[in-house]
Amino acid sequence: MKITALIHDCSLDGETGYAATCVEFPEANGQGESVEDCLNDLRAAVSEVLTYRRSSIFETLAEGERLETLQA
């Protein structure tokens, strides 16, 4: 799966490091001293969002519904 990261250089705000938000999953954010660290943190956040969404969907399945995993 490919995701889009919006990366902010925090030095423009007088701070250090970088912050990123995932365009497709705006609740997933990352930060780090380098762009690489920031993106790794964002990847982990996206993974956590997906894990949470997948686990919580089981609570809403109606009788006769099932989940299938697809490769996007």
What residue ranges belong to the model's regions?
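Short amphipathic alpha-helical segments
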Residues: 3, 24-26
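A short, exposed loop/beta-hairpin motif centered on an aromatic-Gly-Thr core
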Residues: 26-37
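Short aromatic-glycine-(Arg/Gly/Cys) micro-motifs in beta-strand/loop hairpins
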Residues: 8-24
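Short stretches within intrinsically disordered, low-complexity N-terminal or propeptide regions
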Residues: 7, 21-22, 30, 64
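Short, charged, surface-exposed hinge/linker loops at domain edges
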Residues: 1-6, 36, 40-72
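Intrinsic disorder/low-complexity detector
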Residues: 10-11, 31, 43
